[in-house]
A protein has these predicted regions:
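NTP-dependent small-molecule kinase module
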Residues: 345-358, 378, 382, 470-471, ...
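Rossmann-like adenosine-cofactor binding region
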Residues: 235-301, 439-445
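Adenosine-phosphate binding glycine-rich loop
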Residues: 280-358
Length: 521
């Protein structure tokens, strides 16, 4: 006679089913949004009662005996929700290639009163899109910001000055355009306490992002601004002579962006009065440029805050609050250009936190034998993230385990190979990563560990560590290794989680998982 499942097992099964339903519901609502856009484009009504009744009957015929009595009621509710979703005002983000855009998620977190789609178009399709009437408006990204500006009947001052539009609204028979990027940049500086008033600012790059940045710098009262690029008067050959007195540097180029994260344009030590660095790149979250600035004790800020804040101002325009949007970044307002109402700032910060934690890896460092690998495995299981154990990745890439390489070729060769693995995996997003205990022995790895991760240092009592199958621990001794590495564990991490011995391993893992995920809320 087979054992009957207990209540916890049944509830666990129900949780798995509910998660699957939720995934399918997300797919269904996305399809409904696309159907709504199609119907608008072709002048069709959203509600088709005859099709709905046919659908109910077909579902009842194929339903199992447990669900059949509830099918009509369930799908009636589902279709009512779907119609509501299709009837929402339609907005989106316009670009040419948008596979990795975060805009739909950001706007869903700001306002659920409108739907938001990805709108990929070729240049020759822009005119038809602007005339189609399918969308009430959209954000505009590379490479169409200047095209959008030319197609607008009315422009805000930022768009007129920069010649670049990133927010379009179709209203009262007119095409209205805004540039909200400059407000995003103002917010990005302000939240980190970086002031440019009466200061000399060097801007790297001359593209669309740079034009919004120059407008913001003027709005904030910068004393002098320099443009540096390959073909400008100030270029990367003479920048130290021509702009060596810069107090703030802003990177508006894609240099340092994933996947080419290793690059940085300047030697910051050659700017003797430099106070702060800003980077409009948001992936990775801590670029090489910013980490080099941090190492010099400078203030820094990354591009995710700019992305989210500009989207917030756009969301107010889409929601019909153009007056409220007009107060954001307005130098003529009573409180100045940097003013953001407390409620708005709280919401912007909440969305930044959600996206930052989703994009960043959960990366665990600490002594060999402290439980990093199993903890990472458990966190991956709980969160659904992909697990990368760098020791396992090492063996898969090189065909030998770390222990075998150390035994056969020595520690130095192993460390060089380990650096390759760190550079390959750590700049990626959304992973759970367990690092080898000695990853901190090579300073070059600090950039990779920190560039796109929330870094957790797992600290355990030395008596709780095992040196089984750990040749470095066996050779040098746990105590000596700890003394050599502890300062780097402390300075490389964002959070330290410390635990004594537990009677049961599960108690340790459950506590550690709760603590780590709790810090990311």
């Amino acid at each position: 006679m087979s054992e009957r499942p207990d209540l916890n097992e049944l509830r666990g099964k129900l949780d798995e089913i509910d998660n699957s339903i939720l995934d399918l519901l997300e797919e269904r609502m996305a399809a409904c949004r696309q159907i709504g856009n199609y119907k608008r484009e072709h002048g069709m009504d959203v509600y088709d009662p005859s099709r709905e009744e046919e659908k109910f009957k077909a579902l009842e015929e194929i339903a199992g005996f447990e669900s059949r009595p509830y099918v009509r009621e369930l799908f009636k509710t589902l279709m009512d929700i779907s119609k509501d979703h299709q009837n929402k005002p339609a907005f989106g983000v316009l670009g040419r290639t948008l596979a990795h855009t975060y805009s739909p998620e950001i706007h869903s977190l700001f306002d659920s009163s409108y739907s938001y789609s990805v709108i990929e178009r070729e240049p020759e399709e822009l005119e038809a899109l602007f005339k189609s009437g399918v969308f009430k408006g959209f954000n505009v990204t590379i490479p169409y910001k200047k095209n959008a500006c030319a197609m607008c009947d009315e422009l805000d001052d930022a768009s007129k000055t920069t010649g670049s539009v990133n927010t379009v609204l179709f209203e009262d028979g007119k095409v209205k355009g805004w540039n909200t990027d400059y407000f995003g940049f103002i917010y990005m500086l302000t939240r980190k306490g970086i002031s440019v008033k009466d200061k000399k600012v060097l801007v790297l790059g001359t593209g669309g992002a740079a034009s919004a940045v120059f407008y913001a710098l003027k709005t904030l009262g910068a004393a002098e601004t320099y443009a540096c690029d390959l073909e400008t008067d100030i270029n990367y050959s003479n920048v130290y002579d021509r702009a060596g007195d810069a107090q703030v540097i802003v990177n508006c180029t894609p240099v340092g962006m994933f996947p080419k994260v290793d690059n940085s344009l300047l030697d910051l030590t050659r700017f003797p009065v430099l106070e702060a660095c800003a980077d409009v790149v948001y992936n990775p979250s801590r670029t090489k440029f910013l980490q080099e600035a941090e190492a010099l004790g400078l203030k820094t800020c990354g591009g995710l805050a700019m992305l989210v804040a500009q989207a917030y101002k756009s969301s107010r325009i889409f929601a019909g609050d153009t007056a409220g949007a007009g107060l954001l970044g307005n130098p003529d307002s009573e409180n100045g250009a940097a003013y953001v109402p407390a409620e708005a700032a709280e919401l912007i910060e909440k969305v930044i936190k959600v996206l930052e934690n989703r994009m960043r890896n959960i990366t665990i460092i600490g002594m060999p034998g402290s439980g990093k690998s199993l903890l990472a495995r458990n966190i991956a299981a709980v969160t659904g993230r992909t697990l990368v154990d760098l020791d396992i990745a090492f063996a898969e890439k090189f065909g030998r385990t770390p222990a075998e390489v150390i035994s056969e070729s020595g520690e130095d060769e192993f460390r060089e190979m380990e650096c390759e693995i760190a550079a390959e995996f750590l700049p990626k997003s959304g992973l759970v990563v367990s690092c080898g205990g000695g990853v901190v022995t090579r300073d070059v790895n600090k950039f990779y560990v920190r560039c796109n991760s929330n870094v957790f240092y797992l600290e355990r009592p030395l008596t709780a560590l095992t040196d089984k199958n750990r040749p470095i621990s066996q050779l040098h001794g746990v105590e000596k290794l700890y003394e050599q590495r502890k300062d780097k564990y402390e300075t490389w991490c964002d959070y330290k989680v410390s635990y004594d011995r537990f009677e049961e391993k599960n108690d340790f893992y459950n506590r550690a998982i709760a603590d780590i995920l709790g810090k990311l809320k």
